[in-house]
Swiss-Prot record:
Chain intervals with Gly residues compositional bias: 1-12
Cell membrane recorded as keyword: no
Side of membrane Vesicular, spans: 132-134
Cytoplasmic side: 1-110
Protein's GO biological process: positive regulation of response to salt stress; protein transport; regulation of response to osmotic stress; vacuolar sequestering of sodium ion; vesicle-mediated transport
Organism: Arabidopsis thaliana (Mouse-ear cress)
Protein name: Bet1-like protein At1g29060
Protein task: Required for vesicular transport from the ER to the Golgi complex. Functions as a SNARE associated with ER-derived vesicles.
Region of interest (Disordered), ranges: 1-31
């Protein structure tokens, strides 16, 4: 590709440097460094394509804004949910502390009685299943 630039300064051989397949051509404007572009009339459907692309860009911009607002609302919801969870954890922790203090103050071993009853019940069920298993 670099070898094509040496002769005419163009990627397209001897063609104008800004010539493309869509009908763009250049000409020098009165000996200055300015370049004038002329679009061939047979390629006027490019304006329609450009308008269509503008519409698509506008749609994508709207979608991106909606995604951003949805992400913000989701983040706010998660923050609120996290605060609710923290408050609930604090409440549960406080209730467990109160329950432990109540158990210590009462001196009764109700929990120990429940655990022993459960162990005895499982032992009886185990022995019953062994006796009637043949």
């Amino acid at each position: 590709m670099a070898s094509n630039r040496g002769a005419g300064g163009s990627l397209y051989g001897g063609a104008d440097p800004y010539r493309s397949r869509e009908g763009l051509s250049t000409r020098n404007a009165s000996g200055s460094e300015e370049i004038q572009l002329r679009i061939d009339p047979m390629h006027s459907d490019l304006d329609d394509e450009i308008l269509g692309l503008h519409g698509q860009v506008r749609q994508l911009k709207n979608i991106a804004q909606e995604i951003g607002s949805e992400a913000k609302s989701q983040r706010d919801f998660l923050d609120e949910l996290q605060m609710t969870l923290i408050r609930a954890q604090a409440g549960v922790k406080n209730n467990i502390r109160k329950l432990n203090l109540s158990i210590i103050r009462s001196g009764n071993n109700h929990i120990m009685h429940v655990v022993l009853f459960a162990l005895l019940l499982f032992f009886i069920l185990y022995m019953w299943s062994k006796m009637f298993k043949r």
